[in-house]
């Protein structure tokens, strides 16, 4: 019975909503894979323009497979427009190779925005300087320039979910209330 209870707690925690923000993504298969990841993890995906591809691009749909119509995805003309529409209490974390603070030194919470830059350039330097206290790094060997964008998003998103899957909690997402009340 204890195993079932832990399993139920883990499932309930998977109803937590995080926001994945891709700023000017360039490579369709990366975005498609991240869309699929967002769906699987229950996260909302935000695409900040300009995009390096069309949403109906065949390789984007192929990477997202037949899931694309189910993905909670929103397009924004700029990061500023997204930030203006976001909940004012929301926390934003900016993933970059240009900081020493590892992602595991952060306590993630429901509703956090995990922000990632373009595959070739990352996030704008001005954005990183403005939000230096919220910049996070995924540590890697010095000989590696960077990780694949979809890999980075997966690492960050599932670390955030892992942190919130520990212990008993009531999800803030109303769609998940039925799951937690059936425990």
Locate each region found by the language model:
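Post-transcriptional modification and biogenesis factors for structured RNAs
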Residues: 1-183
């Amino acid at each position: 019975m204890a195993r079932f209870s832990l399993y139920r707690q883990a499932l309930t925690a998977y109803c937590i909503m995080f926001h994945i923000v891709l700023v000017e993504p360039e490579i369709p298969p990366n975005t498609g894979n991240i869309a699929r990841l967002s769906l699987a993890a229950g996260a909302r995906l935000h695409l900040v323009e300009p995009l390096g591809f069309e949403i109906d691009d065949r390789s984007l749909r192929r990477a997202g497979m037949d899931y694309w119509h189910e993905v909670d995805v929103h397009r924004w003309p700029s990061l500023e427009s997204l930030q203006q529409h976001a909940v004012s209490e929301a926390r934003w974390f900016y993933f970059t190779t240009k900081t020493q603070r590892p992602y595991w030194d952060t306590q993630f919470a429901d509703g956090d925005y995990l922000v990632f830059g373009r595959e070739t350039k990352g996030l704008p330097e001005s954005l990183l300087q403005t939000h230096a206290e919220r910049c996070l790094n995924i540590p890697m060997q010095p000989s590696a320039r960077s990780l694949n964008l979809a890999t980075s998003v997966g690492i960050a998103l599932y670390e955030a979910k892992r942190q919130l899957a520990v212990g008993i909690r009531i999800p803030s997402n109303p769609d998940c209330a039925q799951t937690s009340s059936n425990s």
